[in-house]
């Protein structure tokens, strides 16, 4: 997996994702095998994402390494791998939980995030990420610092629970 570092203020949409992919210099991407300049578009898959505007289906680009044959999805940093809930929403839910606030209020800006989604985010945080953040003194906000710290210490996006290799590409938009 390759995560593109994007600014927090960019709204997550198919058109924004397509812009990121179309402006990407593929020869600058590095495969998990360590080689650069060998990744080519391999295909696409669809995944559901829940945003401020409701749910939508995002068509995600996959690339393949011509050297080792591994494939990688390319995701913006605003998405948590293997989750429908965006990073900003996850962090708000966790922040509200940590502060003793009504956890459902965090979802008011996300019409398709329900109570089960909230419970899942909190459960994943407590099981996989709470002690990691404490041990490295990592804070939830600002998101850009959180992303950098999690990749630096754990080679993973915050709230990523599958131990799939994930490389951060410093693309800024």
Where are these regions (language model features)?
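Short, positively charged, Gly/Tyr-enriched micro-motifs
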Residues: 69-158
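Short, conserved DNA-binding cores of transcription-related domains
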Residues: 1-79
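Long C-terminal interaction/binding lobes of large macromolecular proteins
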Residues: 1-12, 26, 131-173
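Intrinsically disordered, low-complexity regions enriched in small/polar residues
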Residues: 19-21, 28, 46-47, 112, ...
């Amino acid at each position: 997996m390759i995560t593109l570092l994007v600014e927090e203020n960019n709204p997550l949409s198919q058109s924004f994702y397509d812009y990121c992919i179309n402006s990407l210099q593929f020869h600058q991407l590095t495969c998990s095998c360590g080689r650069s300049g060998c990744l080519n578009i391999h295909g696409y898959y669809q995944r559901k994402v829940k945003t401020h505007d409701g749910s939508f289906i995002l068509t995600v680009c996959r690339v393949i390494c011509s050297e080792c044959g591994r494939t990688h999805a390319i995701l913006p940093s605003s998405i948590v791998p293997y989750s429908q809930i965006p990073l900003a929403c996850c962090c708000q839910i966790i922040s509200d939980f940590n502060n003793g606030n009504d956890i459902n209020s965090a979802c008011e800006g996300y019409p398709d995030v329900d109570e089960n989604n909230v419970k899942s985010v909190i459960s994943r945080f407590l099981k996989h990420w709470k002690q990691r953040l404490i041990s490295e003194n990592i804070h939830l906000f600002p998101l850009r610092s959180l992303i950098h710290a999690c990749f630096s210490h754990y080679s993973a996006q915050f709230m990523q629970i599958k131990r799939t290799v994930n490389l951060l590409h410093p693309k800024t938009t």
